[in-house]
């Protein structure tokens, strides 16, 4: 008699491949064979695919749909699943790095660090003066792989009105960062969702208005914008926070020169490369997507992935404004998320132009009418750093030990 535990490997792989990665923890506990297969087969394959996380009414949900069949006439059905978060906690904001999620919870007063695949969690209290506008980011020290959390808050005692704090998992403590060392000469309060953690560092996208409102100067700016691709308005750039040095790096050039009213969005491919979307209104109505060839805290280079002129496209919404997005490198297509006519939608574009629209449901049912924030996510075997007794330090580690006593274990909030 065939049972779940002795199914052929190809059948198991098919079942696991159709299971949301954030739900695999439950399936791993079914038997040792499923656990090993999910590690050796599913995690490496998931790293090559674009998956996503989003917040729906303060709940974390996984989002996936195949872009491989978009050239066919079949209706593309998105798969949205609520992730089983411990204790049914409500989440205000979500960030991630290295497969680990950083969740802002309880009216922004606490943080939950969580690996959904391993089912490991750790709770961290915010040091003081928690505010809904505080900015957070997660990364790690590349020298010893120890994770850290960056917090940027209002602090009017400092010259720029901002305070910078770092939480070091190795010491279980928050500490203030030196204002003069940290001051990056930019208005961090203009940053909302425009940050991505990559290779242990966090990259912030900064946009500002560097143009005069007078008509003659606008025309001069337009001419420069059209004719010189190398000119960079000073308030449009990337800035990297390096968790190893605990400092901001120099300004990194964008591959285009956006005006303040144009749309720029930031995403990533796995844990290796940044992806940037630019929706132009000035010189032409179109969308460009760029991918990094090289990226580190002090240097970046770009290649154009896709360019689509949306003016002549049949069916493309007139009032379309790009927000979050995801790309499929193999098929050379992108899904760009937007709210249109009270519905949350994913617009699929490619080299052939506008391909199709995927209906994600009424906006009131997904985020209370707010733009759908899609965050590219790759699961990992990186453990959540446990709270260490004084005198002990422990860095980031993979799940290399045996899974002894893990079968059927309950989730515990540590720390």
From Swiss-Prot:
Origin, by domain of life? Eukaryota
Q: Where is this region: Disordered?
A: 209-229, 387-415
Matching entries from InterPro entries are given as: F-box-assoc_dom_typ1, F-box-assoc_interact_dom, F-box-like_dom_sf, F-box_dom, SCF_F-box_component
- CDD domains named among the record's database cross-references: F-box_AtFBW1-like
Transmembrane intervals? none
Gene3D superfamilies xrefs: 1.20.1280.50
Q: Where is the composition biased (Basic residues)?
A: 403-415
Q: What is this protein called?
A: F-box protein At3g13820
- Species classification: Eukaryota, Viridiplantae, Streptophyta, Embryophyta, Tracheophyta
